[in-house]
């Protein structure tokens, strides 16, 4: 239980090939849970098939530095991050009980390259009331990603900074809920408390292109929701994203997409970002080209941002400046 099973482990150097180019078997390369003090550095992990390269849950003090993740094979629309910072839930992370809802904390991913993988790094499932803390994703390169580069679900006190995201379908999503949202087996109160994320998304360079992505394209999205009543097994509660600072990012939109998108948020600061719209003559994408989109959000400030429009497409419906939608926008 907790972080007590695997301790003081180092992987240093070398290449591990998942052989996904030759065989259609799911092949996660490194997987662990209930762990502490794990270091993975100077490695190349390549050719996974419909799987993650590294997957872990209920871990603390994990450092992944100067590694290369490349060449994913398999279903293009699957939820396979090269590094999955996972939620320890029995239906979602099998064979690693005790399922005590231990979150991840003190996770550092730096100086890594993600190229030709389905997704880069992050978390796509969540347990109500379980938050991962002090997650640092900094100084990495993401190249040719057909899904998200970074997906941060239920993160607090975390930072996503100084990353280069090039030729990707979507850049960074930060959310306090998930489509795959599980109830707490410990038993939560009927209403979840409002949580301030106290996190930063800063100084990232993001280029969004058409990857025939099944969802909407965007540079940065913050996503949450207020549920006034219970839905299935999920209790009613405030699942909105609060307290995130978004500043100093450079976002280039090379298809009809959103630059920065706030949906179900509160007290967000969006400052001093540069968004360059470069929609081509034959526009692609599903979102209609809005620089900053705000839906059902309150108490946020958007100021000091620069918008540059060098688009060659003359359809004015494809680009809007700041769009406010909803009673609290």
Stretch-by-stretch model annotation:
Residues 1, 16-19, 275, 307:
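Beta-strand-rich extracellular passenger or scaffold domains
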């Amino acid at each position: 239980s907790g972080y007590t099973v695997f301790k003081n482990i180092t992987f240093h150097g070398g290449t591990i090939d998942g052989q996904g180019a030759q065989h259609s078997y799911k092949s996660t390369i490194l997987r662990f849970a209930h762990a502490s003090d794990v270091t993975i550095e100077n490695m190349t992990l390549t050719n996974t098939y419909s799987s993650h390269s590294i997957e872990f849950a209920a871990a603390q003090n994990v450092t992944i530095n100067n590694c290369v993740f490349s060449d994913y094979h398999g279903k293009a629309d699957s939820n396979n991050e090269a590094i999955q910072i996972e939620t320890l839930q029995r239906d979602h992370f099998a064979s690693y009980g005790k399922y005590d809802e231990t979150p991840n904390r003190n996770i550092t991913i730096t100086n890594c390259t993600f190229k030709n993988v389905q997704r880069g790094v992050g978390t796509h499932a969540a347990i109500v009331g379980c938050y991962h803390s002090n997650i640092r994703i900094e100084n990495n390169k993401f190249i040719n990603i057909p899904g998200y580069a970074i997906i941060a679900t239920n993160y607090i006190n975390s930072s996503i900074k100084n990353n280069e995201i090039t030729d990707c379908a979507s850049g960074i999503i930060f959310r306090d809920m998930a489509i795959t949202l599980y109830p707490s087996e410990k038993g939560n109160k009927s209403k979840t408390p409002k949580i301030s994320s106290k996190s930063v998304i800063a100084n990232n360079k993001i280029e969004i292109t058409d990857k025939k992505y099944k969802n909407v394209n965007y540079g940065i999205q913050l996503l949450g929701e207020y549920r006034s009543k219970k839905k299935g097994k999920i209790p009613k509660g405030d699942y909105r994203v609060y307290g995130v600072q978004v500043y100093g990012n450079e976002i280039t939109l090379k298809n009809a997409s959103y630059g920065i998108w706030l949906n179900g948020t509160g007290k967000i600061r969006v400052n001093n970002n540069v968004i360059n719209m470069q929609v081509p003559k034959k526009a692609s994408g599903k979102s209609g080209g809005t620089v900053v989109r705000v839906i059902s959000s309150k108490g946020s400030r958007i100021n000091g941002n620069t918008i540059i429009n060098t688009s060659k497409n003359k359809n004015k419906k494809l680009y809007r400046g700041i769009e406010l939608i909803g009673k609290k926008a």
